[in-house]
Amino acid sequence: MINYSPVRPLTPSSDDALLADKFEQRRDFFSDVQVFGEYPKGVEAYIKQHGYRPDITDEDRVVLKEGTVDYVAFSYYQTTTVSSEKVKPDELSDLEKAVAVNPTLERSDWGWEIDPTGIRLSLNHLTDRYHLPLFIVENGLGAFDKVEDGEIHDPYRVDYLKKHISEMEKAVEIDGVDLMGYLPWGPIDLVSAGTGQMDKRYGFIYVNKFDDGTGDLTRERKDSFYWYKKVIASNGADLA
């Protein structure tokens, strides 16, 4: 699985456009190796320019060629917007320095861009680049959830998933993407791998546990649980 995030330039400037291209080149490195069985030219050039000299033998290259994948599995949570204000395209080493705030997009409680169209962009970009079946294995919204009178109302999660599934459908029906399946992240609240927090909740099932260690681990279904149950039963036809 790869973590995929389409890259947008913050402005139409040439530097921002080139920076976005360089950023994508670095991001695609891992999946390029898995699909094509060889290192991208741009990455090999970067390695040489920065004095890294990995000992890659002809046997290593044969192993890479023989170990390519049959499909591409990826996670999608957000798009990435980049700006050349702090780092120029040819000086890109620390990717985080290039990341900028996109003023046209909403953001999650943790500052992640909410961009449903981005999942369609991801599917189209990966299809055009790799010509392989795709499988979305993670997609969801990390948010603060509250229990009110024994219930957890999370319309923001339903809205997020509804819009992303709709864009996914467009990619399949309109754009011709070969999509094997879709898995939201995740079925149940758990410690976020990205931040180490329990309060950053993704699940359809609420777990009574908090960052300070309090909570008895009891579980309750959120509103999104019942909504997604209906989505599954209708094979995605009923998103209301």
What are the roles of these predicted feature ranges?
Residues 1-240:
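Active-site region of glycoside hydrolase catalytic domains
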